[in-house]
Every structure is written in C-alpha cells, then in structure tokens.
Regions:
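Short turn/helix-capping motifs enriched in Asx and small/polar residues
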Residues: 1-52
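Predominantly extracellular/secreted Zn2+-dependent metalloproteases
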Residues: 30-185, 198-232
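Catalytic glutamate of the conserved HExxH
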Residues: 20, 184-187, 191-195, 199
Length: 232
C-alpha cells in the first residue's frame, strides 16, 4: 500500500506510479529543487530571515537539489518546526520544485500550454502532484511559485459562526475580508505547508505558516475559506 495514499484520495492506495508509470516514473523522489542561481540566492536570503546564521547549513548540489547539513543547536522551537517541515519535504517520496516569478506555464496531457499566475493565489501558489494528476497536467513534481514582490493579499477569513449552524443568523457573519501581510520567507513556509499537509485539513497549513510568521514578526494569520478544519 502507498504510504502517501491520503494525498491522492481519487486513486487506489494500491496504485503505484499513479497507475501511469510512463509519465510518473520517480517512485522514491525526495528532493526540493531550485534550479537557477538567482532563485537559489532568493531562497538563501529567505532562509537567513528564518534561521539566521543556521541558513549557512543549506546548500544546493549541481542539480539544484536542496540539502541541509548541520545541527539545530540554538534554534527556537518554531525554527526547529519549520526546519523539520523542510526536511520532511526533502525526504518525502515526491519531488518539489521551487521558483520565483509572476507566472509559470505548464503543459496539459495534450501538450497544450496552461499559464498560472501567482496573483491568482495571493502572491504564491502550489500545484500539488496529486492535483496535477487529477487535472491531467503533465508534471511529475509538486510545483511552488513565489512572487518575490508580493507584500500583501486579501483573504476571506472565517469567524466562529462559520463552524456553527448556518441557519442561525444570530451567530453573525461567517466570514470577513482581511488583509494579510506577506514576505518571501512567509510565502515559502505557507507553500511548503501545502506540500506537507496534502490530503489533510488545511487549517494545518496555517498552523505551520504561523510558526514562521512568529519568527518573522508578522501578525498571526487567521483561518480562511481555503484554509480551515473543514477544507481539504
């Protein structure tokens, strides 16, 4: 049985290579890849804001694969949690690519271009391999794209009434529009949270993200209509 079956609810847990070994050939995977030197520099700068001098323990091999070689002495609990999340993605069965820009173009199963903009995701987005298979995109890894210029976005935050009886109007508004401050290390942690919590309730993405936001001195992010205990 595939130990990552929960990430692919639309597939049989006994279905290796997503039942398509021609397109999805990497069963063991397990890397975060950042190809361009410019993007690697942006990533290093983000890690320095999260881990201070420990950011020097990150390195890339000739293929752009991210490694962490060093201890965690002196890191806070939140820093250790974020590093643990990064390591889990690096050691997972799936490959994850990270790049920086405004948009990315991928192919569908018929070879047609599909353009996805970071503005559609509030400054960053993640295409999970599970979603790519379901939508028949021709990709073989999780894809993270970060807009390095994004500084804020708006989300539809949920209130306590969101979890109550929707027919009871006395509970008040279920959602409200709120501004969310962003920066590059914050967005990286958020998107890594999506990879970590694929197939799980998406409040866990915010919980992970808020550990990084605390390190960065950003306000705690609220759950919203796309990230809450009812959303998978």
């Amino acid at each position: 049985m595939d130990p990552y079956a929960e990430r692919y609810p639309h597939l049989s847990p006994y279905c290796s290579f997503a039942c398509n070994p021609i397109r999805y050939t990497d069963e063991t995977g397990g890397v975060i890849t950042i190809v361009s030197v410019e993007d690697q520099t942006k990533f290093y700068e983000a890690m320095a804001k999260l881990f201070n001098d420990k950011a020097g323990n990150f390195s890339f091999n000739s293929d752009g694969q991210l490694k962490y070689n060093g201890d965690t002495k002196g890191l806070s609990r939140d820093q250790k949690n974020i590093l643990d999340g990064l390591r889990k993605v690096m050691d997972s069965k799936e490959n994850t690519t990270v790049s920086f820009g405004k948009s990315i173009t991928i192919k569908d199963k018929n070879g047609n271009d599909v353009k996805i903009n970071t503005s559609d995701g509030g400054g960053a987005f993640t295409i999970l391999q599970a979603e790519a298979i379901e939508k028949e995109f021709d990709v073989s890894s999780n894809i993270i794209l970060i807009d390095p210029d994004a500084t804020s976005t708006q989300v539809e935050a949920v209130t306590d009434a969101y979890y109550g009886d929707w027919s009871n109007l006395s509970l008040g508004a279920r959602t409200e529009i709120v501004d969310v401050l962003l920066n590059v290390p914050d967005m990286i942690s958020h998107e890594i949270g999506h990879v970590l919590n694929a197939g799980k309730t998406q409040d866990k993405v915010i919980d992970f993200n808020n550990k990084a936001r605390k390190i960065l001195g950003l306000p705690k992010r609220r759950y919203d209509t796309n990230h809450n205990e009812r959303k998978r």
